[in-house]
Each structure stands twice: as C-alpha cells, then as structure tokens.
C-alpha cells in the first residue's frame, strides 16, 4: 500500500519538524532527567494547533486528519518521547473522548481550552478488584 501525502500533510509535518528541532529537542534530556513538566512547550504546541488536532474548528481544534496527526506526533516523539506522550493523551484520549461521548455543554466548556493548550487533560483508569497498570 502506497500512501501519497498531500501538500497540507507535508506542510504540517515540516512545520512540526522545525518546531520539534528548535523548541522541543534542545532541552529534552534535561527535562526528562529533572522530571520537569513541559508546560511552556505544550502551550506553544496549543498555539500551533497541535493539542487538539482532530477536533473540529468550531470547538477550537485544527480539524486535521488522522495522517496529519500521526505525522505531527511522530515529529514531536523524535525530539522528546515524554512530550509526545502528553500530546498523544491530550489528542487521542482526552479530546477525542469528549468529542465523541461528551454532551454539547461539555464539548463547549472543555474542548476549546484543551485544543488550544490552555488546559491539559488527564487519563485515569480503575479496575475494581483487579488493580490497574496502564503503563505496562
């Protein structure tokens, strides 16, 4: 199967690659070593439309397709795996769940600040009587 990237997908990939190399990568090892949360970088990523990529524009997102999202995530991951995990959870678990399963009031209240990087979502998992280990 051959996938031909569109001009827009290539533009997104290149923009994120430049951002990742110039902003994310330079202090990635130090952030990981010191366990510093990359809040300032995530805010910049929100301003670039990377924190709610597949969320429709009417909710503050970029309205990007899945291929564009994966290309962007791959470029962030190449620069810093932990920053990519935050981006992935924000886009895939938090924003997508709200978009598909949230009420209209929840979408209006939460999606725009999440998609624009003003708020960071979280993932929690419980399994009664079984324990949970989402890392493994």
Residue ranges of model-derived segments:
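Intrinsic disorder at enzyme termini
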Residues: 1-10
């Amino acid at each position: 199967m051959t996938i031909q990237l569109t001009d827009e997908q290539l533009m997104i990939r290149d923009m994120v690659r430049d951002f990742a190399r110039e902003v994310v990568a330079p202090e990635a090892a130090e952030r990981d070593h010191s366990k510093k949360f990359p809040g300032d970088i995530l805010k910049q990523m929100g301003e670039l439309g990377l924190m709610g990529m597949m969320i429709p524009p009417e909710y503050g997102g970029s309205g990007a397709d899945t291929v564009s999202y994966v290309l962007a995530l791959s470029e962030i991951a190449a620069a810093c795996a932990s920053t990519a995990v935050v981006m992935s959870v924000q886009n895939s678990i938090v924003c997508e769940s709200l978009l598909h399963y949230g009420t209209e009031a929840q979408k209006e209240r939460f999606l725009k600040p999440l998609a624009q990087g003003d708020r960071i979502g979280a993932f929690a998992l419980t399994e009664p009587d079984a324990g949970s280990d989402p890392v493994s």
